[in-house]
């Protein structure tokens, strides 16, 4: 999937005029792409449209109008757009009680080795953004990719084959099937140009 192009990013005035409709459309787009695995992990699968929304919102929040800064934001956020034969997601580690955040995150150190996408009897381990990791600490927001490759991407597009997100961390073991509207939305990413 190609990234967001400069000509697709609106200036602040033009964006403000369509923002309400764009926000409503993005909320609907993200609904089937938000997948909980257990009670602590939520994957929000990204594509060009979700990333474009994030770019527009960041430019709006920071009141960015300088061309070089706009191009910088596009470049940074385009790293979230999945490449060919892959899926990408923002992984949110949800910890509702502030006083538990550090302890719960510490319990999940090493999670980058334990997240998988299964399709039929095949599996691919998630690739985490190395820039977000230290050996003794993780953050509550992670960026992950599932590099399926051509064969597994093709298999994922076959709704007859079961697919699921699976976490096998010693302190957190859960899985969630990928089906219905969620699966269809991710399939559309894999076939997009």
Predicted stretch roles:
Residues 1-86, 90, 94-193:
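Long, contiguous binding/interaction regions
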């Amino acid at each position: 999937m190609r990234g967001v192009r400069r000509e697709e990013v609106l200036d602040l005035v033009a964006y403000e005029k369509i923002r309400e409709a764009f926000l409503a459309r993005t909320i609907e787009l993200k609904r089937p792409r938000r997948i909980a695995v257990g009670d602590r992990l939520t994957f929000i699968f990204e594509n060009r449209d979700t990333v474009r929304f994030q770019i527009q919102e960041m430019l709006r929040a920071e009141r960015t109008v300088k061309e070089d800064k706009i191009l910088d934001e596009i470049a940074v956020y385009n790293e979230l757009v999945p490449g060919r034969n892959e899926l990408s997601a923002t992984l949110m580690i949800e910890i509702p009680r502030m006083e538990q955040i550090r302890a719960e995150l510490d319990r999940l150190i090493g999670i980058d080795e334990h997240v998988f996408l299964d399709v039929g009897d095949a599996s691919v381990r998630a690739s985490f953004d190395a820039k977000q990791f230290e050996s003794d600490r993780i953050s509550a927001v992670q960026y992950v990719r599932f590099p399926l490759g051509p064969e597994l991407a093709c298999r994922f597009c076959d709704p007859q084959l079961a697919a699921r997100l699976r976490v096998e961390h010693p302190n957190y073991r859960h899985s969630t099937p990928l089906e219905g509207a969620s699966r269809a939305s991710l399939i559309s990413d894999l076939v997009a140009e």
